[in-house]
Amino acid sequence: MVNHIRIFDNLFQSNISKFQNLTSKSYIIRNDNEKNSYLPMVQEIRELFGKEGEIFSKSIGTHPDFFGIENTNEYQYICSLFVDISGSTKLALKYSLDKVKLYKNAIISSAIEIFRAFDGHIHRIQGDAVLVYFGHKELEKSDAIINAINAASLMQYFNATTLKKFFESENLEPLKIRIGIDFGDDSSVLWSKYGIDGINEITSTSIHTDLASKFQNKAPSNKIMIGENINKYLDIPKKFRSIKIEKNNGVDVEKRYILNTNNLGRYSMEVFEWEKYLNSFSMLPPFSTENEQFYSPRDLKIRCWIIDEKNQDKYEYIERGSALKKEMNLLFKLEIYNQCLEFKNIKWRVVNYGEEAKKDKELEFEMNQYEGYQYCNQKTAYTGLHFMECYLYDINDKIICHDSFGLFINDNNREVRKLGIED
């Protein structure tokens, strides 16, 4: 991931510079010419994950889908993300209030830009915490959840790299960032106006929005806690999920549930392993290359295209930028960038996860008909996050290196938990 640290370093530094300019006499001139100077970093993130067009939301408060609500109620799904940034108050022990405000604002603003890069809507800033909505009426539910976990993962990566480096350079302990995410389906999220004339807001009423905040509070430091519905909708591989462990009188105790009551039943929570998740991308460099002579995307990379047979065309699918529908024809290609990477043979392997693939006993299989070729064809079939793997062998049939390409598949017809009483 070393190459991508630059994006976050530039994003954070640009926000510091931007807010420093607010106190400068030359700000008005500079602002007219450079008010969008920080946007290229956001655009880089969007392009990296295949996001096209303008960002979804450029405002805070009311979700753009519900500007017209007056004295009515509307039901519509949402994926809620709550992030809390603790540790920034220690800045006040070392700096003047002006400088504390500068750094805190740069941290919050950088977080906002990361969430907006994935089409998140900033609903509320609460001190060092931010409530973000992912999803809107034109977006598939699976894509809203994918956007949320991708944004949350990069937010934690931003903290583990750029912000950690900054705080250590100031001889301060790094920040502790906790993120909670949950999903409420259409019938479980009510949008309406709260308050009185002139003092009101349009917001969501949903236990799943409330639980996002609870999950944040339950998350270990610098981790992401996801609700049961997140996994139910995407069917995330177990290798990217874990049960929170707490010590009780020296004994490890599993904390599986956020709710465990007779009237509401059980509702589970799990830690989303964002480091493992990001490290499994073909398009992102690994966290460590110490034992790797060749690795993606520096020396090689798998790319994927959706084949549109009807229109005799193809469109590139950016890894895990969105979910693919079932029964889509795909073309995978291995691109070699390092001329020193000499190999004798290539083998392709499909690794599926999830209940649907398990039921059909199609979890892993070799693509033998494409042995020796730098491409292979496959079709989407099962809900979940699946991988196409490619292995390169030397003349002695020993593995030189390998790469894997992850893709989400979802028919957006998933059953999720509906807590509470429906109207």
Curated annotation (Swiss-Prot):
CDD domains: CHD
Positions contributing to Mn(2+) 1 binding: 84, 128
Keywords linked to the UniProt accession: Antiviral defense, Cytoplasm, Lyase, Manganese, Metal-binding, Nucleotide-binding
Enzyme Commission number, as recorded: 4.6.1.6
GO biological process, one term: intracellular signal transduction
GO cellular component: cytoplasm
Region (AGS-C domain): 290-409
Reactions performed catalytically: CTP = 3',5'-cyclic CMP + diphosphate
Binding site for a ribonucleoside 5'-triphosphate: 82
The UniProt record lists the keyword Cytoplasm: yes
Subcellular location: Cytoplasm
Binding site for Mn(2+) 2: 84-85, 128
Domain (Guanylate cyclase) ranges: 79-184
Listed Gene3D superfamilies: Nucleotide cyclase (3.30.70.1230)
Listed cofactors: Mn(2+)
GO molecular function: adenylate cyclase activity; metal ion binding; nucleotide binding
Origin: domain of life: Bacteria
Similarity remark: Belongs to the adenylyl cyclase class-4/guanylyl cyclase family. Pyrimidine cyclase subfamily.
Domain notes: Has an N-terminal nucleotide cyclase domain and a C-terminal nucleotide sensor domain (AGS-C).
Function, as annotated: Pycsar (pyrimidine cyclase system for antiphage resistance) provides immunity against bacteriophage. The pyrimidine cyclase (PycC) synthesizes cyclic nucleotides in response to infection; these serve as specific second messenger signals. The signal activates the adjacent effector, leading to bacterial cell death and abortive phage infection. A clade E Pycsar system. The pyrimidine cyclase gene of a two-gene Pycsar system, weakly generates cyclic CMP (cCMP) from CTP, has little to no activity on ATP, GTP or UTP. Expression of this and adjacent effector SaPycTM (AC P0DV39) probably confers resistance to bacteriophage. The genes are probably only expressed in response to bacteriophage infection.
Subunit comment: Homodimer.
Identification of the protein by name: Cytidylate cyclase
Origin species: Staphylococcus aureus
Gene for this chain: pycC
